[in-house]
Amino acid sequence: MLESTEKGGVRNSIRNCLTVFQNDPLLSGAIAKNLLTERTDIIKPIGYNRTGTAITDTDMNYLLLYLEETYGLTSEKKIAAAIGIVANENGYHPIRDYLNGLSWDGTERIRTCLHHFLGADSDPYTDEALRLFLLGAIHRAFHPGCKFEVMLCLVGGQGAGKSTFFRLLAVKDEWFSDDLRKLDDDNVYRKLQGHWIIEMSEMIATANAKSIEEIKSFLSRQKEVYKIPYETHPEDRLRQCVFGGTSNALDFLPLDRSGNRRFLPVMVYPEQAEVHILDDEAASRAYMEQLWAEAMTIYRSGDFKLSFSPEMVRYLKEHQRDFMPEDTKAGMIQAYLDRYTGSMVCSKQLFWEALNHSFDEPKQWEIREVNDIMNHCVTGWHYFSNPRMFPEYGRQKGWEREAPATDTSNGAEKIPEGFVEVTEQMELPF
């Protein structure tokens, strides 16, 4: 029953508009908020031809006409307010609904998927990299804003199907985007809004030192603060997407001696693939559906972590070197240390003697670079923080050669080569 004015007419109130949207046979259950796109959708037929689900200006005109002719409600502002309220009370999430509706057939596909479509190696790393990416995408859908900052990066020649893989992995084309070009754009949220898997094509390969730090920071972000144009107040928009990288260049990773832990490179070899992903798109999409069903089975079990195992972290650090430019300075320093006979070195010494800058005073960033190499790339030396005296360089912090390992398997120390163990009979008589 609608509220009336004192003169007996229908009151143009938000309450009356709400009553109509909640009880009218045509409109009841038609308005809902899409929790993925954060837009208002019309999710059932309401008496006229329309395409898509998101509410449009044309939809609003039809609704205004219907409420005016059927109920005498004419306040556009109050009708719009009622639509916002009823939508907020009837939220749905298309990706969650899709994932919850999957049933796995029991055939494992995660372990071999990247080999099947792209010819990647079938090894524990490739398996764990894809598994982590899938579980991260699922967790972002069910828990927007959760911490997940890794990017699966597919590397290989043009035409291998890398971009198509991510597009089909997103299930629906509207859940995929490759339109992200600038990370510092104030409207970057609009590029992410409504998408589940975002491809960053060649973005890392073309990045300089400054922009790669921006990419790392961007991947680590868990939300965007953004005001949708028709809204009054800005809101925290929690991330619901994950990012996949593609590159034709082998050495696409920046030279980062401390590690590029966010990037999981997988080399693809299309000539070794079992099928090309577009040979039969319907079959590929059916495969992807069962891939997600398998991942959902793992997710429901709770027996997973959104991080690599410790042994895979160690492997990743070495594996990433294959995708970085050659580190010539690290090679020069390691070669110098291999022939150096002293027991300790300092940054200035390495800058002058190993890198052949005999007459240059090192700048602060150059000292930091030497330190970075010694702390992350060189083997056989460990850092000491208490300054020691170097005849040519004064008191300096530095690194000392690690002592050779001792053999304690039989409880005795191993005697260094060239020395003889002193027995009791050989001891001096005093």
Language model regions located:
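DNA-recognition alpha helix
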Residues: S347-F359
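Conserved AAA+/SF3 P-loop NTPase catalytic/coupling segment centered on the Walker-B
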Residues: I197-L219, P254-G259
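A short helix-turn-beta junction within AAA+ P-loop NTPase domains corresponding to the substrate/partner-engaging
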Residues: L255-A273
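N-terminal nucleic-acid engagement/recognition segments and initiation subdomains in replication
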Residues: M1-R109, P124, E128, D360-E361, ...
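Conserved alpha/beta core segments of nucleic-acid transaction machinery
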Residues: I298-G342
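Conserved catalytic/switch belt of AAA+ P-loop NTPases
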Residues: I212-E235
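AAA+/SF3 P-loop NTPase mechanochemical coupling elements
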Residues: V188-Q193, I228-T246
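P-loop NTPase catalytic core of nucleic-acid-dependent motor ATPases
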Residues: I83-Q193
